[in-house]
Amino acid sequence: MAKPCGVRLSGEARKQVDVFRQNLFQEAEEFLYRFLPQKIIYLSQLLQEDSLNVTDLTSLRAPLDIPIPDPPPKDDEMETDKQEKKEVPKCGFLPGNEKILALLGLVKPEVWTLKEKCILVITWIQHLIPKIEDGNDFGVAVQEKVLERVNAVKTKVEAFQTTISKYFSERGDAVAKASKETHVMDYRALVHERDEAAHGELRAMVLDLRAFYAELYHIISSNLEKIVDPKGEEKPSMY
């Protein structure tokens, strides 16, 4: 006869696990009842800031201290000065766009925060999934659906992090080309275009972050009873 198998924990280890679970459930309660509503309000206020409501996108342009070379010499001058080649003017330190960097300073922490909160919710629900057995599993199906949606939000937030990194890469390439091919004005314009596009992307991120928080609040609060008590055996509670 096969021996029953299970995870055996020492008294101290079990105590530590129980403390972790209690802290997790308390964090989840704090997130749902206090953090979520406050964050939605904060992001709504942030969207009213002047820095996220720029109508004249040309005002976002950062100065490019890249010297413009002299026009090419005439043919006769080229013949007489073949051995005298003028070097392309070199540019010095080229800082980033301070206005965009300031916006990134506001938005990046919000992206990281939502990602961490998604992980919190996922971990919390996973600890509420009951023992798998025959019977009424409708509540478990609800848990799985909520987990699926929270994971989808987390994936989209991770894409925001990629978008932010991509901004620096693309802008850096454009600045490098503009400083190397100093006579090509399109490369300079490309730098400005990238900054203007970044402003729109950052505003859209804040809109999405607010929408994601609102969705999390709705989907969790609407299904809270099934999330915390999927079998319908106990009085619903966050913990």
Swiss-Prot record:
Disulphide bond pairs: none
SUPFAM superfamilies attached to this UniProt entry: Proteasome activator
Region Disordered: start-end pairs: 65-86
Single GO molecular function: endopeptidase activator activity
Pfam families: PA28_C (PF02252), PA28_N (PF02251)
Keywords, comma-separated and alphabetical: Acetylation, Phosphoprotein, Proteasome
Gene Ontology cellular component list: cytoplasm; nucleoplasm; proteasome activator complex
Subunit: Heterodimer of PSME1 and PSME2, which forms a hexameric ring.
PANTHER family to which the protein is assigned, alphabetical: PROTEASOME ACTIVATOR COMPLEX SUBUNIT 2, PROTEASOME REGULATOR PA28
Role, per record: Implicated in immunoproteasome assembly and required for efficient antigen processing. The PA28 activator complex enhances the generation of class I binding peptides by altering the cleavage pattern of the proteasome.
Protein name, per record: Proteasome activator complex subunit 2
Organism: Sus scrofa (Pig)
